[in-house]
Amino acid sequence: SKQTDFQVREKLSIVATILAMKTFLGRNESIMWVPISLDEILRVTGAIGLPKDYLFTKDALKANGKPISDDLLMMGVDVTEATPRVYLYPIEIKFSQDDIHSDKGGIQVANTYKLFAERLYGDLNFVRSVYRVFFASQLLTNLDKMKANGMVPDTCYEKIEEIRAKLLNADFDLEIGLPIKQMGAASLVTFNSGPNAVETEIVENVPICHININTPNCLNLLKDTADELKIKSNS
């Protein structure tokens, strides 16, 4: 059915985005990246036990009338200094035949970034500490899943594993923005029939990196990756 086909393509676009982002964000030297479902974060925050005013669950945010992104969060960790540095890079993914959803997607991911800035960045207080530990635990959980599935190099896993206690004690610096400023504070990734393109634009006072990926190219990327994984598993 058309709906099922669209859902499959939507899921494939998430996988393709993760693959593309690992390469794209990899240009920031010394940062190891772990993909996390934003939907999962929004779903679980309600169970932390903080007052409702502090939560950024979907229901709480809908009540404020602010559309947010619930697709993907790339969390980066840099362990080159004594105090680890952590980066948050939210990503909204839009899959369509044309560019009709891009304006809405830019606003969604800009709102998500502003929410992180408000609840996580700045001087440490009790609420920010709780949230930072929660995000760190999500990073470590996803890293463990990736390790179990052979999707993360041993060296990368071991480096983050060494600072597990620091992460879970909020003993890290949460960095605002990436070393490469042109990548913006968040990203909108669109899949359509248009050409591949990258540009940074200001949406709601937030620098958003808009990446357009040609859909046939995306499917070829996935096929090449699947073939590579098959070769690895057979070797």
Question: Locations of the language-model features?
Answer:
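Nuclease catalytic cores
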Residues: 1-45, 105-106, 183
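Short acidic, S/G/P-rich loop/turn micro-motifs used as interaction or catalytic elements
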Residues: 95-100, 194-198
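Acidic, metal/cofactor-coordinating or nucleic-acid-engaging core segments within structured domains
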Residues: 24-30, 96-185
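Extended hydrophobic secondary-structure segments that form protein cores and membrane-embedded regions
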Residues: 35-37, 89-93, 184-192
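Conserved catalytic cores of phosphodiester-cleaving nucleases, focusing on short active-site segments
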Residues: 72-76, 86-97
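Phosphate/oxyanion-binding active-site loops and adjacent basic polyanion-contact surfaces
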Residues: 6-14, 61-72, 101-112
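Active-site metal-binding core of divalent-cation-utilizing nuclease and nuclease-like domains
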Residues: 34-84
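Non-catalytic C-terminal interaction segments of nucleic acid-processing enzymes
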Residues: 146-235
